[in-house]
Each structure stands twice: as structure tokens, then as C-alpha cells.
From Swiss-Prot:
<keyword id="KW-0528">Neurotoxin</keyword>
<keyword id="KW-0800">Toxin</keyword>
<keyword id="KW-0872">Ion channel impairing toxin</keyword>
<keyword id="KW-1015">Disulfide bond</keyword>
<dbReference type="GO" id="GO:0005576">
    <property type="term" value="C:extracellular region"/>
</dbReference>
<dbReference type="GO" id="GO:0015459">
    <property type="term" value="F:potassium channel regulator activity"/>
</dbReference>
<protein>
    <recommendedName>
        <fullName>Potassium channel toxin alpha-KTx 29.1</fullName>
    </recommendedName>
</protein>
<keyword id="KW-0964">Secreted</keyword>
<feature type="disulfide bond">
    <location>
        <begin position="44"/>
        <end position="58"/>
    </location>
</feature>
<keyword id="KW-1220">Voltage-gated potassium channel impairing toxin</keyword>
<keyword id="KW-0732">Signal</keyword>
<comment type="similarity">
    <text>Belongs to the short scorpion toxin superfamily. Potassium channel inhibitor family. Alpha-KTx 29 subfamily.</text>
</comment>
<dbReference type="GO" id="GO:0090729">
    <property type="term" value="F:toxin activity"/>
</dbReference>
<feature type="disulfide bond">
    <location>
        <begin position="32"/>
        <end position="51"/>
    </location>
</feature>
<feature type="disulfide bond">
    <location>
        <begin position="40"/>
        <end position="56"/>
    </location>
</feature>
<keyword id="KW-0632">Potassium channel impairing toxin</keyword>
<comment type="function">
    <text>Weakly inhibits the Kv1.3/KCNA3 channel (1 uM of the toxin inhibits currents by 13.2%) and Kv7.1/KCNQ1 channel (10 uM of the toxin inhibits currents by 27.7%).</text>
</comment>
Amino acid sequence: MKSVCGVLIILVVLTTMLSISTFSTVGAEGDCPISEAIKCVEKCKEKVEVCEPGVCKCSG
């Protein structure tokens, strides 16, 4: 059971790091809450164009 919790924690950390690195390379303007950022990454994969509170636009 401990290994399952460890895997879940690792997945959350990796997802958060991925979303942060994705938005720093995209150059997102404005404040994008981490919860919104994760939703945008899930929706657009790596093609996020705009991430603002309540606004998520995919490029392409």
C-alpha cells in the first residue's frame, strides 16, 4: 500500500513540474493558478497558448 501512495505522489510532482516548465517555455502571461495550469496541460497537452484564470487556449 505504501508503494501505491509513493507512485501517486511522484506522479503529482512530475505533472506539476511538467506544467510549470511548459508554461515557462510558452511564456504564459498573467497569473495562472496551478490548478488551472494542470487543467490546461491535460486539455492541450503541450500546445498551451494562453493560460489565465478561467481562460485556457490551445495553440494549433
